[in-house]
């Protein structure tokens, strides 16, 4: 009770991070007496005195802070200010990521042993020149693949970071399997290890790029460098442990291909499962096409906006690498119009800084963006395109859209531009409510992860309108 009274009449207080606060009261001799709490795992609750001349020599650390050994480990392996300085999904993701890194390290040891065996290590008939030539071909193939893949898919990795992260790790398992099987067919050894290294270089690009995107998501205090550095420290520790375990494992499997292959399949299964759990633990708070499609569908059917946690839990992870081209944002204007009449059809009836063309037969939407189009405009254009796609679906829709869908699905088909014009009017009423619902649910609408090309255009409005 005395402790409680001390807290009630405390002169000042302090706390470490998000830990429990402690109060300070004045003792009879004028010294400061700090209340120490938060040591729940020891069941301690006591007070200690700090004299004016010994302010920095307190007996016990800050309440709510870890004990000295745990504090040291946290300082080495976790970002400063953890857990407040990172996203809520940081810890579960990092734990599963460490498990997958450990399994991958052991699998990599088995693959490296197989490659060295195939090159000729331990074989008196093998020549240095042949081994060197094989190694050079393998490395050069991987370097070229790295450049080509970065050019081909580099701009798309941000949009589906979770899917590409999972894809990269599965491809890494395929690459290691090829390396393990390479010595079995010596005549194809060079081609097999070159293909494997090509896959590993793609993994390096996709994995590194998506890891950077996830670091941006996890860092909540502009501490991306700290989060990245501590992630590297965690990975190094896991790799070190994996190396020590490999030193014990390799002598056991050496000379027994069947047992080695069995270990590899077990580690691969663990690796894929841990990767799936790690990626599934992520809660991205920005909208890409997949998450926007889920949220919009739920909103049109039930009138509620899914929060980021629910939407990320429903987001498919095994698809999305090569999505159907149903929505294209930032297309060139010359692709959509070839006459003044066609331009007038797209422009009239609205003043939004984007033009939308809908191909009903292929359910494909192409959007031309104005020079002034910002994140909100792009989000509206994407919502508009996905809403048009919903007109050809079967789920329940709001009354305005249900009536429009009945007219669309009842032949003969209307001109697409007429439907687009009518949906502009519906969206004028629907989108402000939808946008507010997104913000209230916790989505970050000031930025997005939609795939947008770089084409921009300017145009005049229809005669009854003014210049945009």
Curated annotation (Swiss-Prot):
Modified residues (Phosphothreonine): 49
Principal location listed in the UniProt entry: membrane
Annotated membrane topology: Single-pass membrane protein
Modified residues (N-acetylalanine): 2
Keywords: Acetylation, Membrane, Phosphoprotein, Transmembrane, Transmembrane helix
Lineage top rank: taxon: Eukaryota
Localization in the cell: Membrane
Transmembrane segments: 247-267
Cellular component annotations (GO), alphabetically ordered: membrane
Family as reported in the entry's similarity comment: Belongs to the RUS1 family.
Protein name: RUS family member 1
Species per Swiss-Prot/TrEMBL record: Pongo abelii
